[in-house]
Design a protein with these regions (language model features):
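Vicinal oxygen chelate
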Residues: 1-6, 10-18, 62-71, 73-76, 87-106, 136, ...
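N-terminal beta-strand motif that seeds the catalytic metal site of vicinal oxygen chelate
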Residues: 1-24, 31-33, 95-102, 158
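Short consensus segments that form the blades of beta-propeller domains
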Residues: 3-4, 53, 90-91
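A short secondary-structure junction signal
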Residues: 26, 86, 112-113
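Conserved short beta-strand elements that form part of the metal-binding/catalytic scaffold
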Residues: 34-88, 131-154
């Protein structure tokens, strides 16, 4: 019998926003964060996205910053009409929290356990050898989680 797997660390929080520039200014007003940690960009073109079993285009702009040792990422989807996880979240709930970036004790065992229980990722992102899986537990827990095999961002420096 497989041992119960635990999330070892939450190292990132992803929020979806309508307007990245406006949301950035709101965050700058609300909280103090290291302005030297700010990184902006666009989703990579070479990433394959499989959302709810279907390959999709998922383009977005983002801003990352370090807040108390945790990476916060604000995402503005380019497509606002639905069909990808970020625009669907905006349509359903409006701007706000989307998912946690987590580092489990044993990612492969946890994925295997989810698979045995019939739990499939809602989003698979493949970029070269990197594969990120986002599981949608919103109905049960109110959140989605992205399982990572390493810690990135400010937590990786600790």
């Amino acid at each position: 019998m497989m041992e119960r797997q635990q999330i070892k660390q939450i190292f990132g929080i992803v929020c979806v926003v309508e307007d990245l520039k406006e949301a950035t200014e709101n965050w700058r007003t609300m909280v103090e964060f290291d302005s030297g940690s700010v990184r902006t960009g666009k989703s990579a073109e070479n990433v394959k996205h499989i959302y709810r079993g279907k390959e999709i285009m998922c383009r977005y702009k983002y801003m990352d910053f370090d807040m108390g040792g945790v990476r916060v990422r604000l995402i503005e989807p380019e497509n606002k009409s639905g069909g990808d996880p970020y625009s669907d979240a905006l349509s359903k709930r409006g701007p706000g929290f989307h998912h946690l970036m987590v580092y489990p004790e044993n990612r492969e065992e946890l994925i295997e356990r989810y698979d045995e229980e019939g739990i499939k990722p809602s989003l698979i992102e493949e970029s070269g050898e990197d594969v990120y899986l986002i599981y949608d537990f919103e109905q049960d827990t109110g959140l989605c989680v992205a399982l990572h095999d390493e810690i990135t961002g400010p937590c990786a420096r600790v």
